[in-house]
Amino acid sequence: MRRIYSFLIILLMMSAIPAFAQKGGVIKSRIVSTDNTPLQGAIVSVVGTSSSAISDENGNFELTTDQRKGTLRIVANGYYTREYPLKKRVIPREIVLVPDNFSYYAGTTQYPFYSERRDTRSAINASLDRRDMKNSISADLAWQDGISGLQVVKKSGMPGEGAFFNLRGIHTLVADNAPLLVINGIPYFYNSDVSNVINGYSRDALFGYNANDIKSITALKGAEAAMYGSLGSNGVILIETQQATSDNLNTRISFTGNYGVSLAQNAIPSLDATQYRSYLQDIGMTRYSSAADLRNDYPFLNPGRNAYSYLFDNNIDWNKEITRSAFVTDNVFRIEGGDEIAKYNISLGYTNEGGIVDNTSSQRFHTLINSDVMVSRWVDIFTNVNLAYITSDLQEQGMKYETNPLLAATFMMPNLYPYTRESNGNLLSSYATYNSWNVNKNPVFAYDNVSNPLALVNTVEADDKIYDVNVRAGLNWRPTENWTITGMVNIYYDYTEESLFVPGVTDQAIVPQLYGTGFNYVSKGVRKLSSY
């Protein structure tokens, strides 16, 4: 009886062998698109072997292989790659490929030293390909709303500042919440500090990279992040840039240009001159003992015209005075190709981001040079060189009312004028001084003087200049068909030079710095950051 059972089990196992193995190792199938259109020229291969075939005009192919294990891969231009395990199931008679303009299909998730199909990976990890990212001047803002659990929030409207991002929300109010960035398998330690020169300003994390040079990102939130130790305690974001790894050896030249306008739309609501006069009248009576004392310090509260009407007879929206629509552009020129020995992928780009605060902008010149050279059948050498040069015209931010133009515009009285007015009505080209409206030399309460917002955006010089270099070189050695040993070296260098000049002696339109003792304020700093 046991022999009969054994015979039946063997018979069942033999019947479970894939159909192509029973026919001498021949795989036959038909490749179609989602609309049932036959796909001609699709490449079918068994990964790791020389067995391959190409589909004909009817989408049919026939491939001979003696492999019972491994992966069957189907590649077609303009479609997602599809794979089937030879061991687990019979290859279907009709294989459907999905066009790559569909978002979030299977694809692959890229890890530091291997890739994994998205439909087989851990659900706690997520990835995003370039085709699914947003068009953005900032590389990190291109990920916004792309990955579940990855929070990306733009820091401010200042050009070049980028975004704050974290995984699974804020974990601490003291330490850093940002996840570890890993670019092409190498941890990326960027300058995340707030500037000591330009108040409230911090650089974009990926300021040296163009969004078009990012091939894919993967967010690690689970056990996979443990390989980075305490550095990965806030999660890990794996970034893969464009590489010289395409199987298409034809020389390809492309240009991508994006042009647009940044609009200053939603300003903080502020009082007009009439509303402010009513507000000051009400709030003033809670401090002053009499209306006469209040009107003596603020004569524009008196009904009708008076000797000081030329100073206060205005209605200015200060936010509109210092903001404007700004032009933005992002341009990338790319050339890629190669031959059987060497491949290359080179991009050159120029980015100009105008800020909505007048006279602010950021310009970037960058290049990404990738190469892959096959030294022998078992050895190849690869390099990635990213170079960027950035210059910016900025303004101070944060709770510094003397030099933050947006804060000054919020505090400034709407009935004052940005330029000097004479008592006879003549308008001068010089900026109104910060205390030009102080009509009483001995006020009951000290005047709350505010810097002239228009003078801030036109005379303050806040600049930065950055040289950023990131070089990676490596070697792949394949001692056997199933083993690959990779060695890499990475050098990162960042040079940042910042300067700030706040004038005050000539026009006296800006509240003096250093507790009222410094009329001209100069600050300069240099930061050098390197890692390898």
Enumerate the language-model features and the residues they cover.
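Transmembrane beta-barrel strand/turn architecture of Gram-negative outer membrane proteins
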Residues: G149, F164, D213-S216, A225, ...
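Structural motif
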Residues: G24-L39
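Short acidic/polar hinge/loop motifs at secondary-structure boundaries
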Residues: F61-T64, I186-K221
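Residues embedded in well-ordered regular secondary structure
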Residues: R117-S136, G146-G149, M158-A163, L173-A175, ...
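Short, acidic Ser/Thr/Gly-rich low-complexity loop/linker segments typical of extracellular
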Residues: S50-N60
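Flexible, surface-exposed loop regions and adjacent strand-edge segments
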Residues: V197-N199, S270-R277, Q363-H366, G398-L407, ...
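N-terminal periplasmic accessory domains that precede
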Residues: R89-P99, P112-R118, A139-A142, A163-R168, ...
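Short, acidic, small-residue-rich periplasmic hinge/interaction motif at the N-terminus
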Residues: V32-T34, I43-S45, V75-Y79, R89-D132, ...
